[in-house]
Amino acid sequence: MKALIVDDEPLARNELQYLLNLNDAIDEIEEAENIEETLEKLLYNTFDLIFLDINLMDESGIDLAQKINKMKRSPHIIFATAHEKFAVKAFELNATDYILKPFEKERINQAVNKVDMAKDKSKNKDKTITPKYIDYSDDERAQTHVLPIEVDERIHILNFTDIIALSVNNGITTIDTTKQSYETTETLNHYEKKLPSSLFIKIHRATIVNKEHIQTIEHWFNYTYQLTLTHEFKYQVSRSYMKTFKQQLGLQ
């Protein structure tokens, strides 16, 4: 794949280029230090991915991303910045990933792998594949693989695979993950729109679970189920969601 690094700091560009050169999926790397140079390169070249800083000297990387998205063959955008406060806006622009400085090899490789997987899915979209795969690849929310949440004026980037469940009680949404739990004032509906339906199942009007974290399913009162998830989190499937739950897990 061909990558473009956009950053007005030479040291940051050099560091990122070094790490990308260690990745076998990257065949060619070019650099740009400002908006004008970036747009010129995008006009005459085709890139698979662009690593984009947010604080550029002549313009915001967010504004540049908006311009890139309007291009006919726009590359996958990966924001590479020292500022986490723009994460929500970045994902609203359908960014593939959001990486914080200082860069780490593993994190860079993860971002490159996301682009590689997205390209493979795009190539296979016209092939005959299973309904489960179609559901996941057609769901644009699954392309980023992360959920940005804001807690106490700080934005946390959660990988979908780390999220165990989301539940609401008294207007507070609790997000349980494999590492810790978070509480936010955003509605469950707000997060439901950002989560891929291929991975997350709504089992109650106030609860969404990650089906990959379901450990056991027990018969419960009134012909319902009780679920035990990772870290022994327990949730009940309400009767009104039983049919959908069984269908999504292939229990019928």
UniProtKB/Swiss-Prot annotation:
Disulfide-linked positions: none
Domain of life, source organism: Bacteria
Single GO MF annotation: phosphorelay response regulator activity
Subcellular localization(s) per the UniProt record: Cytoplasm
Residues annotated as domain Response regulatory: 2-116
Keywords: Cytoplasm, DNA-binding, Phosphoprotein, Transcription, Transcription regulation, Two-component regulatory system
Record-linked InterPro entries: CheY-like_superfamily, LytR-like, LytTR_DNA-bd_dom, Sig_transdc_resp-reg_receiver
A cellular component annotation (GO) from this entry: cytoplasm
Record's comment on post-translational modification: Phosphorylated by LytS.
Modified-residue entries (4-aspartylphosphate), positions: D53
Domain HTH LytTR-type: start-end pairs: 147-251
SMART domains in alphabetical order: LytTR, REC
Function summary: Member of the two-component regulatory system LytR/LytS that probably regulates genes involved in cell wall metabolism.
NCBIfam families: PRK14084.1
Name used for this protein in its record: Sensory transduction protein LytR
Species this protein is from: Staphylococcus epidermidis (strain ATCC 12228 / FDA PCI 1200)
Taxonomic classification: Bacteria, Bacillati, Bacillota, Bacilli, Bacillales
